[in-house]
């Protein structure tokens, strides 16, 4: 029995992702084998794992048992809270002790950067105090404007009054390494909390994380620009901050800037108003790494787009890295100049999808641990099964549970969780699915639901299918590739064409607009 389980576990570990294996298979344990009845009993530590393993993995485990014993075997799954404690197969070598982990978190990140700066400071000669800085070096050194809401270099009062923009080092001696590390965070606008170490990885984001690590290791060389897109709360901002934090660790003094697209637009306007645009340009063109978040906010801002285009060209020409995020695929962003879209496409574009079940559980468990709370797996699975959209929603739900538990003086249980999330769970139960959209549209236009997946192209089928794709994009959080997959494995460009076509026709066709309104109200209940 134990030999079989060792064999079975090894095969499943190769077939599954690490997170799937650790979450579902590793906690299982064989507890009994009846050779006369050809039955094998496998224990799971809780009800959620038991139900999930039975529905997802029982067939594969049964097949492996039949192959191992060369006879049909009935695999039974039983509940045993102690299963996880004895899941290692008999005879297996004990795991080697892991080396202690280095401290993580913002304090550790700042400390590492400070040490890096101190090493560089001791090795490099100090520049004479009266040597003027070059414009590009000064632009990288100063980030604070005379007006607090625009990121341009500060000026001595007499120069500001004279309207001159002379660049020079800040007064006084160089700060200590720790102070310089803090100052670097202030200038770069990076959040030291957001690192690769505390980024939970799963199927939904593993490609994006791999690309981010590659860029952090080889900035300006691999994937320039890197364009990450996906819905809100899926970890795009976390990843780009992680890249910036990693580069600060690897390269003390790197010129890095994180900025939200809305702030960039605002700063462009203010730079023009204050006749400080040369300084603005000089600063952005001198960066080593530019992280710009939610670039869809550039939509319709032609002057901002023009200036960003020139900044982009200058940075890439200088082998500086550009990283961009958006809530949607680049070609789907309306109101963006074609020149910019082509530049976005010249690097690597990666989607971040909503987290799968195992990843949602891992996020909840890790977040609870960071709050000093020991969250049971039963509760984590319950929440993860009911809340599926994004990380922020999961973290918000966990905060509600913790607050409810503290206020009522009760331990966290599934019952308490249901009470704490009552309103949220009600909303989730009414959530619109692509499958429901397909059925509703098919009924409305009197076609078969199967026509939504078929390759048929008659107008009486193709048009309702395009309408269903449009509604799926408007009413769900699915990405274009996900929607395409749910419509018979179609390419995301087919979905994009349908969405744009129906959106354009809706603005011109009153009858179509009325039909869409009726469908939307039906779906929203």
From Swiss-Prot:
Coiled-coil spans in chain: none
Binding site for ATP: 233, 235-237
Region (Domain IV, binds dsDNA): 406-525
Region (Domain III, AAA+ region): 189-405
Pfam families given in the database record: Bac_DnaA, Bac_DnaA_C, DnaA_N
Family: Belongs to the DnaA family.
Family matches, as NCBIfam families: DnaA (TIGR00362)
Protein name: Chromosomal replication initiator protein DnaA
Source organism of the structure: Burkholderia lata (strain ATCC 17760 / DSM 23089 / LMG 22485 / NCIMB 9086 / R18194 / 383)
Gene name in the database record: dnaA
């Amino acid at each position: 029995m134990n030999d079989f389980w060792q064999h079975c576990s090894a095969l499943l570990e190769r077939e599954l992702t690490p997170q799937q294996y650790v979450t579902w298979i590793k906690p299982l344990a064989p507890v009994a084998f009846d050779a006369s009845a050809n039955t094998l009993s496998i224990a799971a530590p809780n009800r959620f794992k038991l139900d999930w393993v039975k529905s997802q993995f029982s067939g594969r485990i049964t097949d492996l048992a039949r192959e191992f014993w060369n006879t049909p075997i009935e695999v039974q799954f039983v509940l045993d809270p102690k299963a996880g404690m004895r899941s290692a197969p008999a005879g297996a070598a004990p795991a080697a002790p892991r080396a202690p982990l280095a401290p993580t978190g913002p304090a550790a990140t700042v400390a590492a950067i400070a040490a890096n700066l101190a090493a560089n400071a001791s090795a490099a000669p100090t520049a004479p105090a009266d040597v003027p800085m070059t414009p590009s070096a000064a632009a990288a050194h100063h980030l604070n404007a005379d007006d607090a809401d625009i990121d341009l270099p500060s000026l001595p009062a007499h120069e500001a009054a004279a309207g001159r923009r002379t660049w020079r080092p800040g007064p006084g001696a160089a700060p200590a390494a720790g102070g310089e590390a803090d100052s670097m965070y202030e200038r770069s606008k990076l959040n030291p909390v957001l690192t690769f170490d505390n980024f939970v990885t799963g199927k939904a984001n593993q490609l994006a994380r791999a690309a981010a690590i590659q860029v952090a290791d080889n900035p300006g060389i691999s994937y320039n620009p890197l364009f990450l897109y996906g819905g809100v709360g899926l970890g795009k901002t976390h990843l780009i901050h992680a890249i910036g934090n990693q580069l600060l660790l690897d390269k003390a003094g790197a010129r890095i800037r994180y900025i939200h697209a809305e702030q960039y637009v605002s700063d462009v306007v203010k730079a023009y108003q204050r006749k400080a645009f040369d300084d603005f340009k000089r600063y952005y063109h001198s960066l080593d790494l530019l992280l710009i978040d939610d670039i869809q906010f550039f939509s319709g801002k032609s002057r901002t787009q023009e200036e960003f285009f020139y900044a982009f060209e200058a940075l890439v020409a200088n082998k500086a890295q550009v990283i961009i995020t958006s809530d949607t695929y680049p070609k789907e962003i309306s109101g963006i100049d074609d020149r910019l879209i082509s530049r976005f496409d010249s690097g690597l574009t990666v989607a971040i999808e909503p987290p799968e079940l195992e990843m949602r559980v891992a996020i909840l468990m890790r977040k609870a641990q960071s709050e000093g709370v020991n969250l049971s797996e039963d509760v984590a699975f319950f929440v993860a099964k009911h809340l599926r959209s994004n990380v922020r929603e999961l973290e918000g739900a966990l905060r509600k549970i913790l607050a409810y538990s503290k206020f009522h003086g009760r331990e966290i249980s599934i019952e308490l969780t249901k009470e704490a999330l009552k309103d949220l769970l009600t909303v989730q139960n009414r959530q619109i699915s692509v499958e429901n959209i397909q059925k509703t549209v098919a009924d409305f236009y009197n076609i078969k639901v199967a026509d939504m997946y078929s390759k048929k192209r008659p107008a009486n089928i193709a048009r309702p299918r395009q309408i269903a794709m449009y509604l799926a994009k408007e009413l769900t959080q699915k990405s274009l590739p996900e929607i395409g997959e749910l419509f018979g494995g179609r390419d995301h460009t087919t979905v994009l064409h349908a969405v744009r076509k129906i959106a354009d026709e809706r603005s011109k066709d009153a009858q179509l607009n009325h039909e869409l309104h009726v469908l939307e109200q039906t779906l929203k209940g």
